[in-house]
């Protein structure tokens, strides 16, 4: 859970209240900082002891209390994350089979962020993405873009952001392989970056629609962040019903592939495949279909079936270094 990655799948469920705990093998306790209880922060319990990496995440209440329910038997790293904080040191906790209604009490210390810059590293990607300059309506038509709304649609739902979470650490900085040790400016680094990977044709197509003004916008965005620009707004901590969520995250697939989508049921009848396996779509990154068994906390993969064995694979398409 050090980073948010493509090779993970998460489920969110409503938890029971802290006053009616009947869970087995749970962690409970409170989170406090220098000024007292920390409300609305996340407590993360993560392990690599299971067949695949597993993490369960909950939110503290007004008094800083938390409960992580129904943990599989394993040794866990437990820590605190929250807006206005930096990650606390990880504490070890071992969960073993126990009678129903028993668990471990573990009080945790929150660590305030020493600066706005360090606090902002934990903000949602959108807060960083909001630093991108959007051309004013008066500047349109601009290249192939007839209006500001068309420009925004291309950057968001119709293009870039339909696949990428713009504003994540991986997108708000340019990897050195494209900067070549500073020899390439940001404009040309972005020009090369959008021709990388297995989706190079689609990315280059969308950037061509934005034209040079689009490339300049992306270059100026990452330049500003590199020079120290920070999001102009601070996210609020979870409140109300949002504090009742229990989020479970598993790793699946491989770090060299990316996941575009997944299916767990039929949206017309969500009772279909209850507690069953989850199937992923790796789009053009691999011919393997990742599979998660959330009951066994295990993963597997199958080669994507095709009707005609001569069907070409996108793995044979031109592939830009990435």
Residue ranges and their predicted role:
Residues 24, 96-121:
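Extracellular beta-sheet/turn segments enriched in Thr/Pro/Gly and aliphatic residues
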Residues 33-49, 73, 126-140:
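Short, ordered, surface-exposed loop/turn motifs in non-cytosolic proteins
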Residues 38, 67-75, 83:
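Short Pro-Gly-centered beta-turn/loop motif in secreted/extracellular proteins
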Residues 47-53, 75, 79-96:
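A short, solvent-exposed loop/turn motif at the edges and junctions
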Residues 48-67:
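Short, acidic Ser/Thr/Gly-rich low-complexity loop/linker segments typical of extracellular
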Residues 157-168, 218:
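The canonical Cys-X-X-Cys-His
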Residues 255-274, 316-322:
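Structural signature of eukaryotic scaffold interfaces centered on beta-propeller domains
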Residues 273-275, 279-321:
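Beta-propeller domains
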């Amino acid at each position: 859970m050090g980073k948010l990655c493509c090779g993970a799948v998460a489920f969110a469920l409503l938890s029971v209240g802290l006053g009616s705990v009947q869970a087995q093998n749970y962690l409970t306790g409170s989170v406090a900082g220098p000024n007292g209880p920390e409300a609305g922060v996340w407590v993360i319990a993560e392990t690599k002891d299971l067949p695949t990496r597993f993490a369960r995440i909950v939110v503290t209440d007004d008094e800083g209390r938390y409960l992580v329910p129904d943990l599989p038997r394993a040794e866990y790293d437990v820590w605190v994350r929250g807006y206005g904080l930096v990650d606390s040191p990880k504490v070890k906790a071992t969960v073993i089979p126990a009678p129903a209604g028993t668990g471990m009490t573990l009080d945790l210390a929150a660590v305030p962020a020493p600066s706005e810059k360090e606090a902002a590293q934990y903000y949602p990607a959108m807060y960083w993405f909001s630093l991108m300059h959007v051309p004013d309506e008066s500047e349109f038509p601009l290249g192939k873009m007839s209006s500001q709304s068309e420009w925004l649609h291309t950057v968001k739902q119709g293009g870039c952001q339909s696949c990428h979470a713009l504003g994540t650490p991986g997108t708000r900085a340019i990897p050195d392989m494209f900067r070549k040790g500073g020899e390439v400016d940001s404009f040309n680094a972005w020009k090369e970056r959008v021709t990388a990977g297995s989706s190079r044709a689609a990315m280059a197509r969308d950037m061509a629609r934005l034209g040079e003004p689009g490339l300049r916008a992306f270059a100026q965005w990452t330049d500003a962040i590199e020079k120290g620009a920070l999001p102009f707004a601070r996210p609020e901590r979870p409140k109300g019903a949002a504090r009742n969520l229990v989020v479970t995250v598993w790793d699946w697939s491989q770090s060299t592939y990316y996941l575009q989508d997944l299916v767990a049921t039929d949206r017309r009848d969500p009772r279909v495949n209850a507690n069953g396996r989850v199937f992923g779509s790796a789009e053009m990154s691999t011919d393997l279909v990742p599979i998660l068994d959330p009951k066994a906390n295990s993963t597997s993969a199958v080669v994507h079936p095709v009707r005609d064995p001569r069907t070409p694979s996108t793995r044979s398409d031109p592939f830009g270094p990435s």
